[in-house]
Amino acid sequence: MPKRLDINTILVIGSGPIVIGQAAEFDYSGTQACQSLKEEGYKVILVNSNPATIMTDTATADKVYIEPLTLEFVSRIIRKERPDAILPTLGGQTGLNMAVELAKSGVLEECGVEILGTKLSAIEQAEDRDLFRTLMQDLNEPTPPSEIIHNLDEAYGFVNEIGYPVIVRPAFTLGGTGGGICHNEEELIEIVTSGLKHSPVTQCLLEKSIAGCKEIEYEVMRDSNDNAIVVCNMENIDPVGVHTGDSIVVAPSQTLSDREYQMLRNTSLRIIRALGIEGGCNVQLALDPYSFQYYVIEVNPRVSRSSALASKATGYPIAKLAAKIAVGLTLDEIVNPVTQKTYACFEPALDYVVSKIPRWPFDKFESANRTLGTQMKATGEVMSIGRNLEESLLKAVRSLELGIYHLELDHLKELDKETMKKRIIKADDERLFIVAEAIRQGVTKEEINEWCEMDFFFLQKVENIVNMEREVKANVGNMEVLQTAKEMGFSDHYIAAAWNKTEREIYDMRKENNMTPVFKMVDTCAAEFESATPYYYSTYADENESIVTDRKSVVVLGSGPIRIGQGVEFDYATVHSVWAIKEAGYEAIIINNNPETVSTDFSISDKLYFEPLTIEDVMHIIDLEKPEGVIVQFGGQTAINLAAKLEEHGVKILGTSLEDLDRAEDRDKFEAALTKLGIPQPVGKTATTVEQAVAIAEEIGYPVLVRPSYVLGGRAMEIVYRQEELLHYMKNAVKVHADHPVLIDRYMVGKEIEVDAISDGENVFIPGIMEHIERAGVHSGDSIGVYPPQSLSEKLKEQIIEHTIALGKGLNIVGLLNIQFVVFKDQVYVIEVNPRASRTVPFLSKITGVPMANVATKVILGQDLVEQGYGTGYHPEEKEVYVKAPVFSFAKLRSVDTTLGPEMKSTGEVMGKDLTLEKALYKGLVASGINIPTHGSVIITVADKDKEEAMEIAKRFHEIGYNLLATAGTAQSLAEQNIPVQVVNKIDSEEYNLLDIIRQGKAQFVINTLTKGKQPARDGFRIRRESVENGVACLTSLDTTRAILRVLESMTFSAHSMKEITQTKRHEVVHA
């Protein structure tokens, strides 16, 4: 059927900020969909709140709205733009929920807007647990025994009938939010209560646990002609019981017989047809390993995380084709963009194995509960491709960027059998490593299978790796063993350690013996047809399929998996850099390993290598391609960390030199550079012993900011206010010695300013200056940023501009630089300089219209700023106000403290823009998920040092009609200031207390700056966690609180009695 001509304008709904459960995969799918619809001649309008994406670039759609994804704002856009249709299936759970809300509100009917791709009835049938169960019964498809419940009593009824364990699945939620497995009554009460709270329709499905079954996924496509195909089927190495986003996944499935494969394939196709989905759909199934009994777990009637993985695993662009199907085209009319010869109705075939390993944030949150269950915890993932599972798995392990090069962790070697058993049964982020350790220690595959029901096939693969380790260690210098180890994916790093050599020696040894990998093409058809895609992976085989052209080329290193501190912003910069390289006439080559991102879409670069970002894997590509050089400044810390090793291999680093990168990163060299330039910085020193640290802190005065010199991105940073806190930090957070010194700086309680600039070594251009609402001490990624600055004097602005220009020139920066300043007592100090792209590049690029990554790349390639139409100086400020607000995923990470500090905790960001700061702040806060009611109650529990400041805040809340609640100490301070307050019991009281108020939803805000320690038992910690679990905005920074007050005050009319007004005026006259 040809495309529809009765519609002209389509509104695409994005997925909003990155949170756990919904990451960069929707930037990839949304970008593809918008381009796909524009190709077909439709006018595309996009609404999304996330400025860090390629999707929200003005070139992606005909009109781009960066606005909150709420009913209020999306309805306004629909009424203004009057689209013919909306496409919500590419915006993740957010997009689907928005479509349901828009339909129920009547705005779609009022404006005559049609839903494309998946009908509203299909969304509700797949997402509403009751309707889905009924549909499965109608199709005679088995589901686990289950019951829909709306309260705890109904849950008890089901458990009494079926017994424990049971799985709780809340309706219409993302990444299993609020769900879990209950083994007893205590867990049932906790998880069901949480699930009902998180479900927008207060509904959960309780089902008998089928944990232990194999978990299999089918990614399917269907068009309006009822053509339906399987794009990819995938198998979770972890059995049912661990969320698929937290499971290690392989494609294609490895342990299914043909009969099982066909049985589950037919079921998947039957379900997509019954739902009437036109586009992509993900079906999750459970298979009993000992019979042909299977169960349908759930269906995602949209493009999902798994579809991004399936697209990159097969090369078949699901989102692009789903968009074309949504406008009426059929699979037999659409040409497969990979082969450019076959049609999209051909099912992809794979002649390689793909592995996906999740990237968890536990390196950031050491106190987090690492146990994996039905609620997702990973922030991102890596993917790798190999000719066998062992190779694929080991390549994925070293892609994780945790400093791990093999399936072994030193700290696990000490574990005894009983501890290993417990951890393998329970499942956490290290389970596969523990399985390998257990096999090393002689535990049998039968025992491990009994503990965790992982399939024998996968256990055998792990055993093959362990056996090969023994071979390697027993045959030092043996080339045949080395060849076999390399074919199994062993790294030079591992072999070097086993053979007591350096990694470089192993690399040279292989080159001398012609032992180098070849590159194979990902072509969707197992080489059955010729392919036109430049998409490659390495393996140790015979024929190389990556043909080197005679064009000059440049390699860009990507930023690897999405994690806290290194998000989609770096992928944005990478993609823009690649486009600039192509514009400059070079061949652009990208190396990355994240299946969720736009950068790993094969249509972006001239060549895509899907490989780990280690020196070994990167050098294989450089040895083949022989590029002009490598750009490292767009891939975050991942790429910067490779610069020194690349230079050792004789590779040219393009842009800022390694020496100058080091000058910005090395403490002593940086201090010397600042002194030479006459730029002030906070007083600080380096300690290599605990005694030294104590002496330095005494000398420069508390509070001090302490951090290790060898970790970046705010990890293990803390502000300490007295000696006992410093000693606690030195003992628990770092291991200090001569090689690992600790940096101790005077902590200045001032205003933080962030600047991004582009330098060509001679000229320094500053697109924008941002002011942080939270004072210095809160990580810049967790602060609310405002552009243009609202409270900086012209004099201070000039100082900042002068310092930025001096640093750009003085540090010989070629490309981007990011500087953080603190304004303290009307003086500007430099806190740090990052000689690379920062997370604010997409935000400032969109606001100012300066394509920063593009301009910086052209500078790196030799075109100076003046040639590009920019010179030295500050870009004229925009008239509107723009706010960048952080978004957190605390609800997914139990036992993580929500207090803001120098260590970054946010997973994503949103933008609010308007004519005034108050309106922009309102949009930013609402988009980030903070509800802003104009009245209600606020709980205030603050540390003694904050009491004075909190009084002014409390007074302002009272003025706008809020009811104030506080525990005895704070309440007394408020009463002394004649501020009305209701006293509530502390949390250790047996009677109705502060936590009960939070649980019952009787407070709209909690202001809490108590006990900023990391002990979960502390009062402050428990109050903050309870707020998160119950969806109450918990404010741990008084600056953030003031920002919210500004918004509330702007929304509230003043209500003063006439007497108060006359008294005030009389007072002014008296003191005039």
UniProtKB/Swiss-Prot annotation:
Similarity comment: family membership: Belongs to the CarB family.
Binding locations of Mn(2+) 1: Q284, E298
Native organism taxonomy: Bacteria, Bacillati, Bacillota, Bacilli, Bacillales
Subunit description: Composed of two chains; the small (or glutamine) chain promotes the hydrolysis of glutamine to ammonia, which is used by the large (or ammonia) chain to synthesize carbamoyl phosphate. Tetramer of heterodimers (alpha,beta)4.
CDD domains: MGS_CPS_II
GO MF entries: ATP binding; carbamoyl-phosphate synthase (ammonia) activity; carbamoyl-phosphate synthase (glutamine-hydrolyzing) activity; metal ion binding
E.C. code: 6.3.4.16, 6.3.5.5
Binding site for ATP 2: R707, R746, E752, G777, V778, H779, S780, Q820, E832
Details of cofactor binding: Binds 4 Mg(2+) or Mn(2+) ions per subunit.
NCBIfam families noted in UniProt: CPSaseII_lrg, PRK05294.1, PRK12815.1
Name of the protein in its database record: Carbamoyl phosphate synthase large chain
Domain ATP-grasp, first and last residues per copy: 133-327, 671-861
Region of interest called Allosteric domain, as start-end residue ranges on this chain: 930-1072
Sites where the protein binds Mg(2+) 1: Q284, E298
Domain annotation MGS-like: ranges: 930-1072
Organism (species): Bacillus cereus (strain ZK / E33L)
